[in-house]
């Protein structure tokens, strides 16, 4: 096998392995979205999900997506019920949202466990810029939310 052939194969393997590990998150588009045990409207209805609830897409079919929620539970949902809007869910008792991506920055607001926040921007500092449903924006530690 030639040197360039091996290099090309290594490059392809790297590209495909890194993209295979990329996480795809979406949020639920509307309140009372039915989550199913199979990719069919005839499947067993497992629970209802609320608007903005973040989910991780595991499998994507033509009309359905298999998703994982914050608890690790798997379910199927109609793809048309998913939004591109990125949301994160507070996974600690009380998350501090600050004016800047700094522990010493002024506190803008606090969000309780299970509050959904819109993800506005990633930083490379361990913080995310988020927006509360009431419109307030700030930075939250990535360790205090799920959905990234």
Go through each PLM region and give its residues.
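SH3-family beta-barrel domains
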Residues: 20-37, 45-51, 58-136, 140-148
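Bacterial N-terminal signal peptides that target proteins for export
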Residues: 1-9
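Bacterial N-terminal signal peptides
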Residues: 8-17
